[in-house]
Amino acid sequence: MEIKQIAVAGSLESSDMMITISPNDGQGIVLELDSSVEKQFGNHIRALIKTTLARLGVESATIEAVDKGALDCTIQARTIAAVHRAAGVEHYNWKEIDSWNA
């Protein structure tokens, strides 16, 4: 999926995450994480975001993630929403997304 514009999903409330995604002109994935639980879960959060991006077919993007203790399901949901908004996609392929949980 091609990232065409800047998009944001989520909030800075407790137990949530704000993801900002923008085009990166073919330079791969650049991920910046600011997390209140960085020392404990930083590597896991980065891996989860990158896995979600890969499943969506995103090969190049700049991602700024501000985590306030979000659960995995919230991190995935915010990443999916931000990618679809940034790519200009209006309809989600729920069957594909649901298959990730198998």
From Swiss-Prot:
The modification O-(phosphoribosyl dephospho-coenzyme A)serine is found at residue 14. Pfam families: ACP. It comes from the Bacteria. One of its GO terms (cellular component) is cytoplasm. Keywords: Cytoplasm, Phosphoprotein. It is found in: Cytoplasm. Covalent carrier of the coenzyme of citrate lyase. Oligomer with a subunit composition of (alpha,beta,gamma)6. Belongs to the CitD family. This is Citrate lyase acyl carrier protein. It comes from Streptococcus equi subsp. equi (strain 4047).
